[in-house]
């Protein structure tokens, strides 16, 4: 009986430690973020976690087209929301599958945290949108050079999460597992296909942020017609 009690105490202790470790220490959206450069043009998902609205059979030719529609205007201590138009698309079942599209809006409410947005279908009110954080972004050259601080706004890759990575997993932390409005973990690139070196360093960088990279699935981009 004492052995069983001791085992339960140990399990509870480990659970508490794991829970306390997520989100990882220092986990935050990117500082010094240039939203005008990031939310402009096409991004390609090269790895991501499957989510309810984009399951494994839709991880083909995934793209996100961004256009910044309004910028922040502040008057008398009140700021107008920044709005981003987002057009997502993916092929279903394979690179030659039918194209599935979704029109979304992104809203940035805090001009002092420009890398944190809320994203959702255009037909929904913004208070129902889910979190979207740009955790890090930079150039391929910076990444390949092994830098840990990324200062350029020549954004060629990005690590994105559905907000805080507050759910402990066997391999680290993930955002909002099981919560529709706070799901997702993506690796984005301006090119549909990247070198093995870029992929390895990008995955390693995401892991260094405390994210569970074992949850990432590859997104097929070779052979796609967008």
Label every model-predicted segment.
Residues 2-19:
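Cleavable N-terminal signal peptides of Sec/SRP-targeted secreted and luminal proteins
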């Amino acid at each position: 009986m004492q052995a069983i009690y001791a085992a339960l105490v140990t399990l509870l202790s480990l659970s508490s430690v794991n829970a306390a470790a997520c989100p990882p220490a220092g986990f935050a959206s990117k500082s010094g973020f240039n939203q005008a450069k990031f939310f402009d043009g096409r991004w390609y998902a090269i790895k991501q976690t499957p989510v309810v609205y984009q399951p494994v059979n839709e991880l083909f030719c995934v793209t996100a087209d961004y256009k910044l529609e309004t910028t922040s205007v502040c008057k008398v201590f009140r700021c107008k929301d920044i709005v981003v138009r987002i057009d997502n698309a993916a092929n279903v079942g394979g690179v030659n599958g039918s194209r599935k599209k979704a029109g979304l809006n992104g809203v940035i409410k805090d001009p002092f945290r420009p890398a944190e947005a809320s994203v959702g279908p255009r037909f929904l009110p913004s208070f129902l949108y889910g979190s979207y954080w740009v955790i890090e972004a930079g150039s391929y050259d910076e990444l390949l050079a092994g830098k840990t601080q990324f200062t350029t706004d020549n954004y060629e890759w990005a690590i994105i999460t559905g907000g805080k990575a507050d759910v402990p997993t066997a391999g680290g932390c993930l955002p909002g597992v099981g919560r529709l409005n706070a799901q997702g973990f993506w690796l984005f690139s301006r090119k549909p296909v990247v070198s093995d070196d870029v992929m390895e360093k990008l995955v390693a960088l995401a892991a260094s942020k405390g994210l569970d990279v074992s949850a990432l699935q590859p997104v097929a981009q070779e052979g796609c017609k967008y």
